[in-house]
Amino acid sequence: TLLGGTFVDYDKQTSSGTVFGKTNVVAQKAVVNGGLRFISEEQKETTRAKMREIVAKNLPQTSASIRFTDSYPAMGPTGGNLAVLAKLDQVSKDMGQGGVAPYDPLKRGAADISFVADYTDGIDGLGTMGSGAHTPQETVNLKTMNALIQRSALLIYRLTR
């Protein structure tokens, strides 16, 4: 979320706001709200330090501040997670659905599994396929559901053996 203008009213509950300003003046206020994705606490802290450094170098006669709120914890790759992924890959191949490779951490979002990642092996991304994720235009391709459900069920079965 990015809002800027002479007057800015931001509602954290709805992640929305209203602004007023003119195009021929410099905005008096700007509010930016977003999330950081990281695979380790070290990476998170390094990134935050760099962002603080940038914010501290604001222009003369201006002020800037930055705050961070932890949300999803880091979930770095582990041997256990890669073993679960290898099982999913084999299940997918056995079902004729093709191989499954790790998704680039730079392109993924946060995952609920991150909250228990320190305590158990797991993977994310077993859900539906579609487009427009996390937007009002989000769609789900229902034709993929049966294959994904079957693949997940077989993975769970094989993990118990």
Predicted features by range, described:
Residues 1-161:
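Metal-dependent amide/peptide-bond hydrolase catalytic core
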